[in-house]
Amino acid sequence: MAARSIALGTIRFANDAPFVLIGGINVLESREFALEVAGHYKTVCTKLGIPLVFKASFDKANRSSIHSYRGPGLREGLEILQVVKDTHGIPVITDVHSPEEATPAAEVCDIIQLPAFLARQTDLIEAMAKTGAVINIKKPQFLSPSQMSNVVEKFRECGNENLLICERGSNFGYDNLVVDMLAFGVMKHCCNDLPLIFDVTHALQCRDPSGAASGGRRSQVVDLARSGMAVGLAGLFLESHPDPDKARCDGPSALPLALLEPFLQQVKAIDEVVKALPTLSVS
């Protein structure tokens, strides 16, 4: 099966092409913060020759606690993302949570993302599809890999073929996630080899059953990223923070920003080795 390819300007997403980094922060904390972090990502990725799409959320609509920080909201958040895009000359991605957010988000962002918890919401899918934007579909934690074909089919029936699919772990008992390495191949097969992204940081989430926010295992991010890259991915989804312990959301899963360059050096090395190997089919 030939790998599907999705173009985003000069960036090409395909499972047999050099990987693209969808990297950034979990949630927008301020304009200055977003510009600073995006600038660091651009510097590192330019040095290493890694295509970059900068990620940030304007609203974390699915926080566990009503008291948790959600973000600046749609209007201010999109204004910040536009400034980041214009200042650094890099494409941007954000997630949307309601049909009304799809069009304004697509007017600013190069990719819009369907959150994992909302991946079966048909009205939202239809609104996102109609924008014509490239869509990153997060696989829900509760959905089997093969069931992603139904989500993909909804988008196609709504007229959008510009699709990326994203693995972010699966429920393993209560309050825990695991990444099934066999799932990558299943998702590629059932979705006709659409470009596959691996969200390594959200896959590290592990909840305290009595806690009001998600915990995480960022000490294992290198292990998980190396493992994921070995299956041949179109892209890696990564969130970083200069001080993860002070992050407004998902700090326990975030890579310390100071480690971005050595981390990506290792990831790129594995990607290059894997994609230089001949295809070996086992029936």
Swiss-Prot record:
Pathway listed: Carbohydrate biosynthesis; 3-deoxy-D-manno-octulosonate biosynthesis; 3-deoxy-D-manno-octulosonate from D-ribulose 5-phosphate: step 2/3; Bacterial outer membrane biogenesis; lipopolysaccharide biosynthesis
Enzyme class: transferase
Organism: Prochlorococcus marinus (strain MIT 9313)
Protein name as it appears in the record: 2-dehydro-3-deoxyphosphooctonate aldolase
GO biological process: keto-3-deoxy-D-manno-octulosonic acid biosynthetic process
GO molecular function: 3-deoxy-8-phosphooctulonate synthase activity
Subcellular location: Cytoplasm
Enzymatic reactions: D-arabinose 5-phosphate + phosphoenolpyruvate + H2O = 3-deoxy-alpha-D-manno-2-octulosonate-8-phosphate + phosphate
Signal peptide as annotated in the record: none
UniProt EC number: 2.5.1.55
Species lineage: Bacteria, Bacillati, Cyanobacteriota, Cyanophyceae, Synechococcales
InterPro entries: Aldolase_TIM, DAHP1/KDSA, KDO8P_synthase
Entry's family note: Belongs to the KdsA family.
